[in-house]
Amino acid sequence: MNTKHVTCRYFLHGVCREGGRCLFSHDLATSKPSTVCRFYQRGQCAYGARCRYDHVKPCNGSVFYPPQEMAPAPLESTPPLLPTQEAAAPVTKSAPQRREKKSVVLRDRDLCGASVEKAHPDPALRPGCAADPPVSELEAKPHSYLEAICTGLDETPIPSAYPDAPQQLCPFAQAGGCHYGESCPYIHGNVCEICGLQVLHPYDQEQRGHHEKLCMANFERDMERAFAFQASEGKVCSICMERVYDKQSPSERRFGILSNCHHTYCLACIRQWRCARQFENPVIKSCPECRVISEFVIPSAYWVEDQSKKFELIEAFKQGMGKKACKYFDQGRGTCPFGGKCLYLHAYPDGTRAEPEKPRKQLGSEGTVRFLNSVRLWDFIEEREQRNLPDAEDEVAELGELFMHLSGVGEEPPAASN
């Protein structure tokens, strides 16, 4: 079925979203319904510029839509009466007196007098239209609820969605390139000598100083990392005799730095050494080469040899470990064997930190002093309960054999001599 000869009703209302792909006709010459707003010609359109119909003023000879409640008299048949004629005219009782209706004040005064101005030059004698009120009165009294709501909105400037757009730096130029070029509404900043990006505001000196300071700090940090990587590249582990950065797994490319020693070890080898149980505690805590005891091992991605930087690394390591809860203390439910020397957090469930216990001292017979951990009575009871006691039956059997041996039972008598 061909629908091109049928006028699209959505196009008549101005809301057809198909455009050129529409199957119906968009030719207004063949459309019968009028798209002219009748309420606008009456001066009563409340939609204003948002109306979907055409707001066209009627020309001379065009059809004028009067208000529905008004019934204007014909202009040619009944001439208007002058004030003197109205006074002399006889009043007849037979003629029904029609109640005079209130005239409608049009919003557009030119619209009211466009078709009647030539016939009735006097504004007071225009039919269907009252005398024009003063302009100030029209402006003071709104004609509809919509107009009353919108009063003053047209004069108020609409704030821009980007009030500081001319003062902002272009984010595309900061990232490396803006394809808008000179037509970009944002400012293209000056090029920073350190990072090489357009991030310096040409007018804001505070922003320029802040960025230069931040950029210089990042540059110094990157240079320190580059020097640290260069110093760590050729380090060889003293246990496995392999270069640390040449290991296959990236997780193994870390150094195990001893707190009191400067020998090089990879983290996996030195941890394996300190976890051995076949040696005494002072042996496994000491360096495999110089035998200097170190309390802990610090994992690091770079080798640190300077003593000041090593102290900074140790403090950062302690602060990081101090934020993790100790699994032996277990929020007060357990006992940590390391006591106050533990690097992990000893805190109760409410967040209160536990005070480190003072170590107990014991003086030996030879004058030596030993530090003891917390001693509890239950430890002695548990040790006694777990002690292997001799079986009573074994003791009875052993005593019986001893008694029989002493009494001479079971021994063969000596042979009689001939």
From Swiss-Prot:
PROSITE patterns: ZF_C3H1, ZF_RING_1, ZF_RING_2
Reactions listed under catalytic activity: S-ubiquitinyl-[E2 ubiquitin-conjugating enzyme]-L-cysteine + [acceptor protein]-L-lysine = [E2 ubiquitin-conjugating enzyme]-L-cysteine + N(6)-ubiquitinyl-[acceptor protein]-L-lysine
SUPFAM superfamilies noted in UniProt: CCCH zinc finger, RING/U-box
Any GO molecular function: zinc ion binding
The UniProt record lists the keyword Isomerase: no
EC identifiers of the protein: 2.3.2.27
GO biological process: axis specification; cell differentiation; DNA-templated transcription; embryo development ending in birth or egg hatching; negative regulation of inflammatory response to antigenic stimulus; negative regulation of neurogenesis; negative regulation of non-canonical NF-kappaB signal transduction; nervous system development
Pfam families associated with the record: zf-C3HC4, zf-CCCH, zf-CCCH_2, zf-CCCH_4
Reported function: E3 ubiquitin ligase catalyzing the covalent attachment of ubiquitin moieties onto substrate proteins. Inhibits neurogenesis and axis formation during embryonic development by modulating the phosphatidylinositol 3-kinase (PI3K) pathway. Acts downstream of PI3K and akt1 to up-regulate gsk3b mRNA expression.
Species of origin: Xenopus tropicalis
PANTHER family: E3 UBIQUITIN-PROTEIN LIGASE MAKORIN-2, MAKORIN-RELATED
Region entry Disordered, spans: 76-100
Region span, Makorin-type Cys-His: 192-221
Subcellular location: Cytoplasm; Nucleus
InterPro entries: MKRN-like (IPR045072), Znf-CCCH_4 (IPR041367), Znf_C3HC4_RING-type (IPR018957), Znf_CCCH (IPR000571), Znf_CCCH_sf (IPR036855), Znf_RING (IPR001841), Znf_RING/FYVE/PHD (IPR013083), Znf_RING_CS (IPR017907)
Domain of life: Eukaryota
Enzyme class: transferase
Descriptive protein name: E3 ubiquitin-protein ligase makorin-2
ZnF region ranges: C3H1-type: 2-29, 31-58, 164-191, 320-349
Keywords of this entry: Cytoplasm, Developmental protein, Differentiation, Metal-binding, Neurogenesis, Nucleus, Repeat, Transcription, Transcription regulation, Transferase, Ubl conjugation pathway, Zinc, Zinc-finger
